[in-house]
Amino acid sequence: MSSLLTKTRMLNKILQKSGTEPVAFQDICTLLSEVLECNVYIISKKGKVLGYTFGKDFECEAMKKKVIEDKKFPEDYNKTLLEVNETLSNLPNEGRCVFQEIGKCKKVDKLSTIVPIIGSRERLGTLILARFGNPFTDEDLVIVEYSATIVGMEMLRAMQDEITEDTRKKAVVQLAIGTLSYSELEAVEHIFDELNGNEGLLVASKIADKVGITRSVIVNALRKFESAGVIESRSLGMKGTYIRILNEKLIDELKKIK
């Protein structure tokens, strides 16, 4: 078995990436599974599986279905996980499956370790490890808790990136709307009311007649939105124009104007 220092160095290699490149949760799961010889799962606060690696020769169809197919742990089990506020190590399964609806477990020597993932004093998720017959040592737990800290930092980073991207998308839409004339703005409001979703077919002449504007006003408005990357459009000849919204903030921002 590798020493604590060797294991830590292996984990640190994951972090030796550029400052802008996020650490993949799957990479952490894979490495932990290799160095600790166990199953590893990273679960979000809502129970979504963000990363996982099964240990060598692991056989459990129930677990594989939850993780691989559903990509989500049952709500009742996740609720139990969220009640854990500090590391719980080497929990025996005592012949019971962690999923209540399944009941008995064929393996009677399974040991689980549950580690809360916390960032900025907020519960972000859970790191779960499972091994058969061989308890997790204090040395193992040092590695596991260090890993949970890394995962917490990456979750916070991902959340910040999501907020930044959300802000950027709103700004792009607001700039695009700001380039429209009054009649063009009136046109796009009717266009996206008619669209009834994120994509669809538009007949410009019908909307022009309905609103009382020229067809060129509609065409100019669509061109401005397309050049801003907010929508994409494609002429289908006599059938009309196919429109697809690329920036999901568009509809929300248009609603604010009404």
From Swiss-Prot:
PANTHER family assigned to the protein according to its UniProt record, in alphabetical order: GLOBAL TRANSCRIPTIONAL REGULATOR CODY (PTHR40062:SF1), GTP-SENSING TRANSCRIPTIONAL PLEIOTROPIC REPRESSOR CODY (PTHR40062)
Primary localization: cytoplasm
Residue spans binding DNA: 204-223
Protein name per UniProt: Global transcriptional regulator CodY
Keyword Transcription among record annotations: yes
Region (GAF domain): 1-156
Keyword terms of this UniProt record: Cytoplasm, DNA-binding, Repressor, Transcription, Transcription regulation
Domain of life: Bacteria
Gene Ontology cellular component terms for the protein in this record: cytoplasm
Subcellular location: Cytoplasm
Family stated for the protein in its record: Belongs to the CodY family.
Name of the gene: codY
Matching Gene3D superfamilies: 3.30.450.40, Winged helix-like DNA-binding domain superfamily/Winged helix DNA-binding domain
Residues of the signal peptide: none
GO terms classed as biological process: negative regulation of DNA-templated transcription
Pfam families membership: CodY, HTH_CodY
MF (Gene Ontology): DNA binding; DNA-binding transcription factor activity; GTP binding
